[in-house]
Amino acid sequence: MARNFLLVLLWFIVQVSSSHENGRGDQALSQIDIYAINLAQHHSAFIHVSPLVLGSQGQDTEWVNVVISNPEPSSDDWVGVFSPAKFDSSSCAPTDDKEIAPFICSAPVKYMYAKSSPDYMKTGNAVLKFMLINQRADFSFALFTGGLSNPTLVSVSNHVSFINPKAPVYPRLALGKKWDEMTVTWTSGYNIGEAVPFVEWSRKGTRSRRSPAGTLTFTRNSMCGAPARTVGWRDPGFIHTASLKDLWPNLKYTYRMGHELMNGSIVWSKNFTFKSSPYPGQDSLQRVIIFGDMGKGERDGSNEYNDYQPGSLNTTDQLIKDLKNIDIVFHIGDITYANGYISQWDQFTAQVEPIASTVPYMVASGNHERDWPDSGSFYGGKDSGGECGVPAETMFDFPAENKAKFWYSADYGMFRFCVADTEHDWREGSEQYQFIERCLASVDRRAQPWLIFIAHRVLGYSTNDWYGQEGSFEEPMGRESLQKLWQKYKVDIAFYGHVHNYERTCPIYQNQCMDNEKSHYSGAFKGTIHVVVGGAGSHLSSFSSLKPKWSIFRDYDYGFVKLTAFDHSSLLFEYKKSSNGAVHDSFTIFREYRDVLACVRDSCEPTTLAS
């Protein structure tokens, strides 16, 4: 009987924790039934794209005009953007005898309904504007009728291409394993047998240096299941990472990526700048952005059916607008919501390039990056769309010992960040639990007073509706093992995503508020403040009708958090709206070193009266 009860409980946990509201059709491209596509080209219909050559001024993004003429217009006609431009069955992966190859083997990288042009339904003529990014291959556009569920190919356009499809693009900065290191990761079409990748960099008044880059990629066979192995597959190109070492603290550096071809010529990227990290414990102004579950948007309005990540562009644009006042960003899981449609990783890195090329863009693993049955993930859902962590671990760098175990520590000036991986076991006795305790225990709080815990799923507290139904207002098994660590090592704030809203607790320990103050905390540590900040872009999650006393601020809207450390004693917390950047919730912590040392409940080792 006990065994049957345990099996039922585990099934419930998987269902609640893996699906939640996230199991919906959350990737626009997944709505297209690729296997149902048939061919019925209309001799009087045509579609034409211009300009033919893109990026002639060095751009990696360009707008194109798509002219359509269709003598039989319908409200469900749509235009798909395909890359590579040749997308018929001749490009299909080999199939066994039991599997019938579809007419088209891959999903488009984006699509738009023809009726987006106001006169299309009246005249059958339309001009659509698409924004294309350099994705290492040419493009063609296809006109379909029959909607997304029963599409029929009517006409195919000419091909267009960037002047150099292989060019190095979309740099992503990350903290290295040492405080004076910064890594640069980027994407190109150059394999190491064709060109040697490197980064050239310098600070003002010094000679430039070159750092070699390692090159990685992944293949269809690296994916765990569909759609990543099937219609969602697209060659990711080559991902290069260089480590810039021996950086001086808090100085501005200029860099660019290069590929030296076999003939000795060099293909260069644009120039970029960043500010190096402060020395651990350095007393200087330090500003941190934290959010989860942003996903991506389309500036051209394509994929317009999909309102799954309606806040994504607003969050991105607010960060770009305030970039001069940001030092580092943490995107804590559910990064792209590509869900097995590999082309969307390029789309996302292009969207965040203005941010990620300028400040370290640190990521954590979420269910939409990692989860797949029988793949070693803690949850058995299919939220990754068959990616099982591979694109996230390859496309972004982070200072983990093992990329497949997505947990790491990061030091930035007066901050210590302990980043957990909720898609692997975190409970007491696990390898990750040991890491978390080491990360929390090893920080010198005199030098780094601000101790931050980060995880994707809510291992702490949330009044989200489905956590309320589950009964404990947390990810099942979430805080039972960890709360004694947060208390013992006096974690100031714990951040989570996964739940798509904003919520802040009181300083809390074992379900009890340890401090009734709401906006100004001072003196000795009493308990960890838990913050859900998963409302950066994806569809919003509703709150439970129950509101425990520990929940002191909730917001059903899109936003992100900014932490500002003024010195070793003063920290400002701000929750900002993505729509306008306005501060909607805030508090301050003032805590001197003697307050950090002060013994509170369950936070100090046993003492002796011996002299």
Swiss-Prot record:
Keywords: Glycoprotein, Iron, Metal-binding, Secreted, Signal, Zinc. Expressed in roots, stems, leaves, flowers and siliques. GO terms for cellular component: extracellular region. Its cofactor is Fe cation; Zn(2+). GO terms for molecular function: acid phosphatase activity; metal ion binding. PANTHER family: INACTIVE PURPLE ACID PHOSPHATASE 24-RELATED (PTHR45778:SF6), PURPLE ACID PHOSPHATASE-RELATED (PTHR45778). This is Probable inactive purple acid phosphatase 27. It comes from Arabidopsis thaliana.
